[in-house]
Curated annotation (Swiss-Prot):
Residues that, per the record, bind ATP: 169-176
Annotated gene: atpA
Enzyme Commission designation: 7.1.2.2
Protein name listed in UniProt: ATP synthase subunit alpha
Site keyed Required for activity: positions: 362
Family matches, as NCBIfam families: atpA (TIGR00962), PRK13343.1 (NF009884)
One Gene Ontology term of the molecular function aspect: ATP binding
Stated role: Produces ATP from ADP in the presence of a proton gradient across the membrane. The alpha chain is a regulatory subunit.
TM regions (residue ranges): none
Organism encoding this protein: Desulfatibacillum aliphaticivorans
């Protein structure tokens, strides 16, 4: 058989033309040891901090420790499938999450993957989980209100757009309820919301999502969930992922509100990862950079300057205290980072004052500049009246023969405490809050028993809406109480007082 060179070269050329095998060039390493959600990997010399690496089976890991001869990787999936000697691939990507309108109405995990069973996200943009906070020049002072719909907060510890206001208190006294009410209050505003559940029970997160869906708030809300059963790495990443989603709106000149529920559990997750990575422990066994961990997260909430679009990201971080100890390490850290705190007290909660906000210990360091004039007019004396009432209440417990002025002050204080109570999931618009606080501050409630305040309030709203809509409309439109509105409100409340008197006899 004769071998012809032309034929052979022709066959080789055709085979080269049809050759379509892709060559996968990626830097790989080997797992040296694995345990407790941490893998030591040898051979990834060019790995970057916070880079995602891929283990067999598509499990992702986050590079946290860069050491001389190996890297420490926190695993974000099922650890049982990874063993010593496994190959690890670099992805070349720093941790990123999908952002934009596509994530609204969805429940995602700590890396932005959907977990609500509604199919894949059709997000076109992604954003790095870790971003540098805006500098001093890029910011503007807080000057626009961000309403929570809660009388006690909006009157005495007002929150402005771009502010960081801490919600702090023991377990099971309504911290999440305050945060969820703040989301519900944004229904007819231009604020998008992100709720980050960090280290919560799955049943609790499901309950929050069901509440948001029931009141139509999921349309403008994203829920980022890293539950207690998820790897510590996802619990650590979730707040940063949620923040990146909020920053997308902030940098587009829009407004966003983010709730971190709660940062105590994120700190515990970070402590766990740090100790397993053999980083030196500090106070309460937290790593030395735990303050930086929270400060770099909360500094990303800001009111941006007009040149950069005048957007804002408002943060409501939640911290859980142990037996009311606000002087513990994590609570003091976060108090010093934030622009004020709303302190919830078990004593008030069990006495039936809900939301259980301790007015004396709660402050808002920058919110006053953002408060509407109408609210300033009615809430100006409120804090002082309540503080004096608390003082007199303790004093009155010892003596019964009090002078008329003291009795009047006690009577006024009791009614003010009652009108600051509010049912869950019932945020109020500004005009309704102003109307009831106006009634309290001007003594229109003093003639009625303290236990009839809830009935008085409900009746007053419907009375004003039906018979004096101009008064409510003027407050909503002008955002202040003019002399005409003041006179109209007083006339309306006198008329309603006579009507209400007949109903309680």
């Amino acid at each position: 058989m004769e071998i012809r060179a032309e034929e052979i070269s022709q066959i080789i050329k055709e085979q080269i033309k049809d050759y379509d095998k892709k060559v996968d060039l990626s830097e790989t390493g080997t797992v040296l040891s694995v345990g407790d959600g941490i893998a030591r990997v040898y051979g990834l010399e060019k790995a970057m901090a916070l880079e995602l690496v891929e283990f067999p089976g598509g499990i992702l890991g986050l590079v946290l420790n860069l050491e001389e001869d190996n890297v420490g990787v926190a695993i974000m999936g099922e650890v049982t499938h990874i063993k010593e000697g496994d190959m690890v691939k670099r992805t070349g990507k720093i941790a990123q999450v999908p952002v934009g309108e596509a994530v609204l109405g969805r429940v995602v995990d700590g890396v932005g993957s959907p977990i609500d069973g509604k199919g894949p996200l059709d997000a076109t943009e992604t954003r790095m989980v870790e971003m540098v906070a805006p500098g001093v020049i890029a910011r503007k002072s807080v000057h626009e209100p961000c309403y929570t719909g809660l009388k006690a907060v909006d009157a005495m510890t007002p929150v402005g757009r771009g502010q960081r206001e801490l919600i702090i208190g023991d377990r099971q006294i309504g911290k999440t309820a305050v945060a969820v009410d703040a989301i519900l209050a944004q229904k007819d505003t231009d604020i998008y919301c992100i709720y980050v559940a960090c280290g919560q029970k799955k049943s609790t997160v499901a309950q929050v999502v069901a509440t948001l869906e029931k009141y139509g708030a999921m349309e403008y809300t994203t829920v980022v969930s890293a539950c207690a059963s998820d790897p510590a790495t996802l619990q650590y990443l979730a707040p940063y992922a949620g923040c990146a989603m909020g920053e997308y709106f902030r940098d587009k000149g829009q407004h966003a509100l983010i709730i971190y529920d709660d940062l105590s559990k994120q700190a515990v997750a970070y402590r766990q990862i740090s100790l397993l990575l053999r980083r030196p422990p500090g106070r309460e066994a937290y790593p030395g950079d735990i303050f930086y961990n929270h400060s770099r997260l909360l500094e990303r909430a800001a009111k941006v300057s007009d040149e950069l679009g005048a957007g804002s990201l408002t943060a409501l971080p939640i911290i859980e205290t142990q037996a009311g100890d606000v002087s513990a390490y994590i609570p003091t850290n976060v108090i010093s980072i934030t622009d004020g705190q709303i302190y919830l007290e078990p004593g008030l909660f069990f006495a039936g004052v809900r939301p259980a906000i301790n007015v004396g210990l709660s402050v808002s360091r920058v919110g006053g500049a953002a408060q509407e004039k109408a609210m300033k007019q009615v809430a100006g004396t409120l804090r002082m009246d309540l503080a004096q009432f608390r003082e007199l209440e303790a004093f009155a417990a010892f003596g019964s023969d009090l002078d008329a002025a003291t009795q009047k002050q006690l009577k006024r204080g009791e009614r003010l405490v009652q009108i600051l109570k509010q049912p869950q999931y019932a945020p109020l618009p500004l005009e309704k809050q102003v109307a009831i606080l106006f009634a309290g501050a001007n003594g229109f409630l003093d003639a009625f028993p303290a236990d009839s305040m809830a009935k008085y309030e409900a009746g007053m709203y419907s009375f004003l809406e039906s018979k004096y809509p101009d008064a409510m409309g003027a407050i909503a439109k002008e955002r202040k109480i003019s002399d005409e509105t003041d006179a109209l409100l007083k006339k309306a409340l006198e008329e309603y007082g006579k009507e209400f008197q007949d109903t309680i006899q």
